[in-house]
Design a protein with these regions (language model features):
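Viral virion structural and adsorption modules
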Residues: 1-95
C-alpha cells in the first residue's frame, strides 16, 4: 500500500493507493501495474486509478531479482511513476 494524498475529481482528498492489477510478460520483458485510489484503507470501491507501463530496461531490476512480487510492484511505482515520485508518497509494508 502506498500513501500519497491527491485531490480527486470530486474535490476531496484521498490517499490510500492499493495494487489493483499486475500484468507481467516475463518472456518479452514488459508489463504494467495499476494502483487504485481509495478514500480509506477499509473502503471496498476505488475512486481512481493510475497505470504505469514497465519498460524492458527496468523489468529485470524489479521483477527477476527475487523478493516479494507485491513489494517489488509498489517499489517500482514509487521509483518510476511521476505521481508517486513527487514529495509525500510513503510505502506501507502490509504483505
Amino acid at each position: 500500500m502506498i500513501i500519497k494524498k491527491v485531490r480527486t475529481q470530486f474535490g476531496v482528498e484521498a490517499e490510500v493507493w492499493k495494487l489493483g492489477y499486475i500484468s507481467l510478460d516475463r518472456v518479452a520483458k514488459y508489463g504494467s501495474i495499476t494502483m487504485n485510489l481509495y478514500f480509506t484503507e477499509d473502503a471496498e470501491q476505488y475512486i481512481d486509478s493510475k497505470t504505469q507501463l514497465i519498460p524492458e530496461e527496468k523489468f529485470d531490476e524489479y521483477f527477476e531479482s527475487g523478493g516479494d512480487l507485491f513489494e517489488n510492484c509498489e517499489r517500482f511505482m514509487l521509483e518510476n511513476c511521476y505521481l508517486f515520485m513527487e514529495d509525500g508518497a510513503t510505502h506501507l509494508n502490509v504483505y
